[in-house]
Amino acid sequence: MEARDIILKPLITEKSVAKMSEGKYAFKVRLDANKTQIKQAIEEIFGVTVVRVNTMRVRGKLRRQGKYIGRRSDWKKAIVQLKEGDSIKVFEGL
């Protein structure tokens, strides 16, 4: 699996922006990706040193479209802690 296939997109929320000062960044990743793959992908894409990776599965919410009930897809969130002094340039200025 390619590194860019594992990391789907960065998560920009109020909570994740607050954690950036601690060197923690949040990403949406593939459901089948493990912590080792996520760490290698972040290091390859952004050229930083990853200290810790925490992952969690997020269940999809129920949604209605008129009388029909559907469900959004489940997804996986990864919170990556970088070595002190490292930062990801994509998130600069947030």
UniProtKB/Swiss-Prot annotation:
One of its GO terms (biological process) is translation. One of its GO terms (molecular function) is rRNA binding. Keywords: Ribonucleoprotein, Ribosomal protein, RNA-binding, rRNA-binding. One of its GO terms (cellular component) is ribonucleoprotein complex. Part of the 50S ribosomal subunit. Contacts protein L29, and trigger factor when it is bound to the ribosome. PANTHER family: 60S RIBOSOMAL PROTEIN L23A. One of the early assembly proteins it binds 23S rRNA. One of the proteins that surrounds the polypeptide exit tunnel on the outside of the ribosome. Forms the main docking site for trigger factor binding to the ribosome. Belongs to the universal ribosomal protein uL23 family. This is Large ribosomal subunit protein uL23. The gene is rplW.
